[in-house]
């Protein structure tokens, strides 16, 4: 089905758009521009929607707003926001009544005229997606990068050519019950996450599986050789499977051994580059590069791989150096919204840091994080909803030594940053690496990182 055909199909149907956030605003504009009957459903009130709400109203949108925004979903087609899973009772009831449940991203995947490389996982999605896009661009392709990375693509479909590439970062919320058939899919890793939204861990894992379930036999799935869930994913994959590995050679894929990264085809290896040539630090970023190399194998040559490795300086809020003050270096790793990501950041730093931890409670365990903080941090400052849980995990660790690891609970975010600065000495590192999402105090991890930057820049 073409984009034009899809607009013809939707015209005349009652369309509900659940959530009026970043991804659904351009969707609403496109639907209204094409003469569709659109109702925006959002928990905010009319004033909170601001200028974008005024624009939609001027184009003919209707609204169901406030706390009961999910109670009257009498529509033929419903586009849900990623944050509202299709398993919520109101959406289930709507589906049982005949409504078609979809999303901006599912519609994009089904209508996109070019090849799609889709990336999911618990950690490293944005960096891997960005590296993949940079590799393709270095090879001369036109690339459309979007999805969970923050750039909606639905309204760009008419401008996408068959010879282009779409690189999509997909979250478990986007993938839940979604049908997609990417030409290449990557799963970076799997660890417990978002258990405040998913009913259980299996539901979270199953959502991730949607990235490959609809692939064609000629599709390719790229998997992490050391992840415990990889055998299951490989067995279920409809198409070819390639691996990226930091634990030894693989028959087909990309691996790193003795500090050298190779690509392998049927066991025959070819050097791509030395791991030390990668500009951004950390073993986890070597893995992100290997995943991207595996996904673009046959599309991107070694020269482009080396060029990107030498020049790509990373994505904001990911091990981002903010400033040095009185000999103390401040690192913004606000994206670290899970324990595994924070642990990877600790291992990437050249010395034990003063670490700022805590945020929104996603109901995931902190036991391993407690051990790693005791082993690899100089001091810890905890803040937010999870402050007491993280502090308890640190104190419960068999590695905990009160005399060696100062542990402070801060009353607010500014106090956390100022306390961390006070605990540091010249030559030390202070890192914001929360191991939690930001929604207790901030709209998103970007706002948290920007607030950290502003506080750090105000320090004397």
Predicted segments — roles?
Residues 31, 78, 119, 148, ...:
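Residue-level signal for inorganic ion chemistry
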């Amino acid at each position: 089905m073409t984009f034009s055909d899809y607009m013809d199909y939707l015209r005349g149907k009652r369309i509900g758009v659940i959530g009026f956030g970043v991804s659904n605003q351009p969707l609403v504009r496109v639907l209204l521009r094409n003469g569709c009957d659109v109702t925006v459903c959002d928990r905010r009130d009319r004033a909170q929607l601001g200028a974008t709400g005024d624009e939609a109203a001027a184009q003919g949108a209707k609204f169901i707003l406030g706390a009961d925004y999910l109670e009257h979903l009498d529509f033929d087609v419903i586009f849900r926001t990623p944050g509202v899973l299709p398993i919520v009772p109101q959406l289930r009831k709507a589906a049982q009544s005949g409504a078609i449940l979809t999303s901006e991203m599912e519609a994009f995947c089904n209508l996109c005229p070019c090849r799609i490389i889709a990336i999911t996982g618990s950690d490293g999605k944005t960096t891997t997606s960005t590296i993949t896009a940079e590799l393709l661009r270095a090879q001369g392709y036109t690339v459309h990068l979007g999805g969970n990375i923050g750039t909606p693509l639905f309204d760009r479909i008419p401008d996408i050519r068959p010879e282009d590439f779409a690189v999509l970062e997909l979250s478990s919320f986007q993938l839940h019950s979604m049908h997609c058939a990417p030409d290449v899919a990557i799963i970076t890793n799997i660890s417990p996450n978002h258990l405040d939204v998913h009913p259980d861990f299996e539901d979270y894992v199953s959502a991730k599986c949607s990235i490959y379930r609809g692939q064609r036999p000629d599709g390719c799935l790229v998997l992490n050789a050391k992840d415990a869930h990889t055998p299951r994913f490989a067995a279920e994959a409809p198409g070819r499977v390639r691996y990226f590995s930091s634990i030894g050679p693989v028959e087909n894929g990309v691996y790193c051994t003795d500090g050298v990264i190779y690509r392998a085809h049927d066991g025959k290896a070819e050097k791509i580059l030395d791991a030390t040539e990668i500009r951004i630090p950390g073993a986890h970023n070597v893995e992100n590069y290997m995943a991207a190399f595996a996904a673009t194998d046959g599309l991107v040559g070694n020269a482009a791989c080396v060029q990107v490795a030498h020049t790509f300086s990373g994505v904001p809020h990911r091990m981002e150096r903010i400033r040095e003050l009185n000999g103390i270096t401040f690192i913004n790793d606000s994206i670290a919204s899970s324990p595994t990501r924070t642990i990877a950041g600790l291992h990437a730093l050249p010395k034990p840091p003063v670490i700022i931890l805590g945020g929104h409670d996603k109901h995931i365990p902190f036991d391993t994080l407690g051990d790693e903080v005791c082993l690899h941090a100089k001091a810890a400052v905890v803040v937010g909803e999870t402050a007491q849980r993280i502090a308890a995990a640190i104190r419960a660790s068999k590695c905990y030594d009160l005399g060696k690891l100062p542990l402070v609970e801060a009353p607010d975010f500014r106090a956390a940053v100022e306390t961390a600065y006070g605990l540091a000495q010249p030559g030390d590192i202070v890192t914001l690496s929360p191991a939690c999402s930001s929604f207790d105090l901030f709209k998103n991890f970007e706002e948290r990182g920007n607030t950290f930057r502003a506080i750090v820049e105000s320090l004397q």
